[in-house]
Every structure is written in structure tokens, then in C-alpha cells.
Amino acid sequence: MKRHEAREKAIQTLFQIEVSKLEVDEAIEFALDGEESDPFYEQLVTGTLEHIEDIDALLVENLKNWRLDRLGNVERTILRMATFELLYVETIPENVTINEAVELAKSFGDEEAGKLVNGVLGNIIKED
């Protein structure tokens, strides 16, 4: 599984966990749909969930004139996963993480979602 596909599947999994209230194992099984799992995919899902409180706190600090609960589910999920990747996956350059997150936001959402994701993640790396 390529990293882009792993990110897409991780977004789908995290979305299912939040919106459908599926258990982690059920959401993984649903997203993989019979495909073999991937270590990077698993790292994104489990890592995002393990660090979700810290990630959400950082997102709240960097959302200008927005509240986290007012974001769309897709945008919130992408921001959480990308923030995890920025903070905890040191082998991937920040610009790659941000570009991938923006593309995912455009793919799952729209152009405005991409702009929002780009702005918030840009603020996070400026802080770093």
C-alpha cells in the first residue's frame, strides 16, 4: 500500500470511528475491505487516536475564528491525522504531510476545505 493510499484509508477509518462510533477493529476491517493492512496506515490510525487530546488542544490553539466542533467531520479528521503525522512521524518532511493533507481535503471535501487545512497546518509548523 502506497503512503497516499494509506492516508486515504486512515482518514476513512478515523471518520468511521468518530461518525459511526465503530470500534477501532471494526473500522479498520471496514476501511481495508479485505486488503492487507500496512504499518504506516496502522501508525496513522492508532497514533492519531492515542494522541487525540493533545492534537485537539493544538488544533484549537491554531484555528482562527473557528471552534473544533464547528469544523466538518472530514476536515477535522484530516487535520487530526495530519497533525499527528507532523508531530510524531519524523521520517516525512512537513511539506509532504501538508501537501497530502490538502489534497485529501480537496478530494474528500472541496477547494475551501483544502485552504482551511493548509492554513491550520501552516500555523502549526510556524509554532514548531
Curated annotation (Swiss-Prot):
Keyword presence, Membrane: no
An annotated GO BP: DNA-templated transcription termination
Keywords, comma-separated and alphabetical: RNA-binding, Transcription, Transcription antitermination, Transcription regulation
Pfam family, one: NusB
A GO molecular-function descriptor: RNA binding
Listed InterPro entries: NusB-like_sf (IPR035926), NusB_fam (IPR011605), NusB_RsmB_TIM44 (IPR006027)
Keyword RNA-binding: yes
Protein family according to the UniProt entry: Belongs to the NusB family.
Alphabetized HAMAP family for the sequence: NusB
UniProt-listed NCBIfam families: nusB
Full protein name: Transcription antitermination protein NusB
Species of the source: Exiguobacterium sp. (strain ATCC BAA-1283 / AT1b)
